[in-house]
Curated annotation (Swiss-Prot):
The keyword ATP-binding does not apply. One of its GO terms (cellular component) is large ribosomal subunit. InterPro entries: Ribosomal_bL32, Ribosomal_bL32_bact, Ribosomal_zn-bd. Belongs to the bacterial ribosomal protein bL32 family. SUPFAM superfamilies: Zn-binding ribosomal proteins (SSF57829). One of its GO terms (molecular function) is structural constituent of ribosome. It comes from Bacillus pumilus (strain SAFR-032). It comes from the Bacteria. HAMAP family: Ribosomal_bL32 (MF_00340). This is Large ribosomal subunit protein bL32. GO terms for biological process: translation. Keywords: Ribonucleoprotein, Ribosomal protein.
Amino acid sequence: MAVPFRRTSKMKKRLRRTHFKLQVPGMVACPECGEMKISHRVCKSCGTYKGKDVKSN
């Protein structure tokens, strides 16, 4: 099995890991109730999506 010829430096290791981070979700205000929600998702407070009532009891 192959082994690394040289030890990976702290800088190279950290530069490689710069992309391993959490993404911030795109938050927008709901046009119906004004509550903050994730874009392209159903609003949790009023249950609407694209102007239609999706969450009905």
